[in-house]
Structure formats: structure tokens, C-alpha cells
């Protein structure tokens, strides 16, 4: 059977400006609900774009068709051909008066979980039966928004002269020298799943690519088991030649504002489904120095932060709330971090080398992005690698790119899932991933 016979329209396509009253159409999807009232039967058909009411009046329709509709099993796959009747009280403002209902696949009963929203399910239950959970309107809405956010991200980069790249995910050495790596067997050698495209982005700067971005998977073998950590995630990465950290911060904040604006414009039904009202963040974002952050935390907490400490969850909450209370905005930057707590490739200030030209972009109580101007001077880079207890020989492929004309450059990486999580106010980062991989979950 051809696609044209199974479906001519999505449910959301049936509008007075597109479809005539009485026009014959074919919808296809899942049986969301069956309401049998004796003399009348309502079948709610659900597809990717929404729901449509199929109305069968016993006295006006073939008995065999009426009885078949009453027997439909929830979540079975059907195709319905009939005539459109615009009706204000019906879902989406119309109902379909069927001439033919074809059952394409019958669902087992009972279902592993409810899809109507009448019965709540725990996240683990939903993830165990993800194929059913993805049929829920709220779940679908999240991934439609994620799709639009990534599409807008690509649009923004292309409009601003970036080249999209794809770097290796199987590597011979750690990107940042950490131990949080997944080892794999690569024929007769040990290899790792890449934790960041960082080193390859910088090599591309030596290659003259000038402005690059990548949207791809990263892998972190960290044993965190929290609502905001994943072991496989999607990273949005940027690298720009002839730029410093302030230049790429501007690119980042403008990207965030652009994506929000596009989601607001193009995802109205999904935002309504989730009950969310977004506003475009104001740019430029507030910039706080690391030292200012220490002062803010220590003035508001008995638990003190000392120079050289990372921010920590408690500090993120204090500073994020301070920024929101004073500016009404959620996004902000923390700049000028101590050199020793940033990766080896972060450029130190010439006049105060204990500080680096680095930044984190925050959203209230969560880090979304980390970036810096990079070291482009070979001797300094090698020295920084050694100072962090790493062997430069393991980075030979990377260091060579700096010996034959590396321009000054800067960049950042941002976690896609955290970006979506904070945009939508999602409680758990796993809600923003189709099939999340965390410390405890490897299936489905």
C-alpha cells in the first residue's frame, strides 16, 4: 500500500485555509482513545503533529464500521479515510466522518504505561518503555523543541561564516588529560571514546579553517549519578581564529539569544503543550570575575570559597540567585579563572599568569559552557602540558600543528542537553535525550 493511500495529511494540516469542508482526506496514526457512548463513538487518532477526533454516529454509518471502531485497541496503528467537518468544539476545530478504518497493527493490552497523561509514571518507568513514552505529547514536545534549537544553532553558525566539521570519536589519547575515559579495543591497540573535540578543533585553526563548529557526541566516564549528568552527551563546539575570549563570548551569548527567539517563533504548539512561556535573554550577559564570585559567595554563605577552588553546587546556587535577583536574567559569565584549575590549553594573562583568559557561561544554578582563548605559542603550550603532570609525547600529533604557524584563537563547548534542560526548566537531564546513557542505564 502506498504512502498516499495511508496518509494524505497530518492532523495539524487540516485547517480551513488548507482543506475544504467536506473534503475527503486520510489520516494515519495511533488510537489515542476510544469513547463509546452507545449511539455514538469517538475515536481520537494521534500522530506526530497532534490529535483528531473521528466521529461515528450509529444511525448514520455502516454497522460493521461502527462495531469495528468500538473494538479498536488503544495504541493500535490505524489509517482513517473520511470527510472533514469543521466543528469548533472538536479537537483542532474539526472532526473526521469516516468511510474506512484500516487497522495496520494491533497493540497488545495492557500497555506498559499510560500515554494520555491521566496516570503519571516515574522517569525510570518511562525510560524502560521509551517507545511508548515518546508517544506522549509532552515528550514529543521536548524533542521538537530540541530539533528546532539545533536547527537554529546551525543556521546561526552558517549565517556567521562558520564551517561545520566532524572530528574523530575514537582517539589514542585523552583530550584534557583526565581519567574519565571509556577505553575500547581498536584492533591490537588501546583507544578511547573522545571526551571532547577540543584538540582537533585547534588543529583546524592551524589548517586555516578560521571559524568552525561541530555538533556531535562526547563521552565522559564520570561516576556522577545526578539529575544533570550524562555519560554520553551532545556537545556544541566552536573555535575561531584571530579571536580572544571576549570575541567568542559574544558569539555564544548571541547564539543563545538567537536560538531562544527561533524556538519562541517556531515552537508555539510545543511550548503550549509544556506550559512554558519563554523570553529571549538580554545581551550582553553579565560578566563576573572569579574574584567577584568569591566575594558574592563568602558574603552570603557560612561555607566559604577560597581562591583556587572550583565553584561547586552550593556556589552555583548562590551566584545564580544573586544574578537573577539583581538583573532579572538567568544567563551570565564567570571570567578570569585561576590558570591551574583550567585545562592546559587555556591562555594565561601575560601580566598575571596565575589567571587565565577563560570563562564559564552559567544559567542560574548550572554551568552550560566553558571556553577560553587558547595558547597558540608552542613552548608555552608544552610547558602547560607538563605542569599538569602530562607527557607531551602523548600529544605529539597536536603539538605539531603549533610549530608551523598557529594563529591566535579561542573557542568554547556547550552541552546541548543542559542548554535544552535549562531552557525548558526540565527537572532531569535524561528528559532531554531520546535514549539516555548514564552510570546505570545502557538500554534501551
Swiss-Prot record:
SUPFAM superfamilies tied to this protein: Class II aaRS and biotin synthetases, Nucleic acid-binding proteins
InterPro entries: Aa-tRNA-synt_II (IPR004364), aa-tRNA-synth_II (IPR006195), aa-tRNA-synth_II/BPL/LPL (IPR045864), Asp-tRNA_synthase_2 (IPR004523), Asp/Asn-tRNA-synth_IIb (IPR002312), NA-bd_OB-fold (IPR012340), NA-bd_OB_tRNA (IPR004365)
Cofactor(s), names only, from the UniProt record: Mg(2+)
Subcellular localization(s) per the UniProt record: Cytoplasm
One Pfam family linked to the record: tRNA_anti-codon
Quaternary structure note: Homodimer.
Role noted for this protein: Aspartyl-tRNA synthetase with relaxed tRNA specificity since it is able to aspartylate not only its cognate tRNA(Asp) but also tRNA(Asn). Reaction proceeds in two steps: L-aspartate is first activated by ATP to form Asp-AMP and then transferred to the acceptor end of tRNA(Asp/Asn).
Name listed for the protein in its UniProt record: Aspartate--tRNA(Asp/Asn) ligase
Species this chain originates from: Methanosarcina barkeri (strain Fusaro / DSM 804)
